[in-house]
């Protein structure tokens, strides 16, 4: 059985539909930075997703290549995630999607070193004849957060965010969104195959003691 991060780390990928407090450890990611409306058909975001999965599957299938990754075990590629912000806005203004700045990411297994990552960039570039220069090795220590499973359309997220913030305050915490700590989403559903009202998205916000 391939190792599935969603199932092995349910506290990070499968929270309940009610808010909870969690401390997220440092993780490494495949990452692409960009800006603009994620719904644009030919926008940066759609291109970024293609780049991310190109590297993610190159690493996953490295077991069939000459480059052998030390400590490799078979695994399910983790879900797509995104860190989002807007200049001059505290939190997210869903009515201004064209102003989004984002870092789109896919988690890397801990056994993937920076050298393995660099190999994957070279391999994918050669095999797919495509430019992967925007893809980076990204380490992030998220720390203390409030999170909740949001079920429904992305535009309906504000209601879940409101419940998260109310719970956070009741527990003695305050929001800690900064230039380094951002609105975070983990996408558990394939938007191409799942109806908007059934989409599952983990929403996570950084917090600190009030």
Predicted regions and their residues:
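A solvent-exposed interaction/effector surface
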Residues: 1-210
């Amino acid at each position: 059985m391939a190792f599935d991060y969603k199932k092995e780390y349910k506290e990070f990928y499968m929270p309940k539909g009610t808010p909870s407090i969690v401390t997220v450890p440092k993780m490494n990611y495949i990452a692409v930075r960009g800006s603009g409306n994620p719904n644009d058909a030919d926008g940066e975001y759609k291109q970024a997703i293609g780049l991310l999965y190109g590297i993610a599957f190159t690493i996953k299938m490295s077991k069939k290549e000459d480059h052998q990754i030390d400590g490799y075990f078979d695994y399910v590629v983790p879900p797509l995630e995104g860190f989002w912000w807007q200049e001059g806005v505290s939190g997210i203004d869903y009515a201004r999607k064209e102003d989004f700045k984002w870092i789109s990411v896919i988690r890397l297994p801990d056994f993937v070193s920076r050298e393995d990552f660099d190999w994957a960039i070279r391999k994918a570039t050669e095999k797919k004849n495509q430019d992967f220069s925007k893809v980076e090795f990204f380490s992030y220590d998220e720390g203390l957060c409030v999170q909740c499973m949001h079920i429904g359309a992305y535009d309906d997220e504000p209601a879940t965010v409101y419940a998260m913030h109310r719970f956070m305050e009741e527990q003695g915490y305050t929001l800690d969104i900064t230039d380094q700590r951002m609105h975070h989403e983990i996408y558990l559903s394939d938007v191409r195959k799942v109806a908007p009202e059934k989409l599952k998205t983990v929403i996570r916000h950084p917090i600190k003691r009030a």
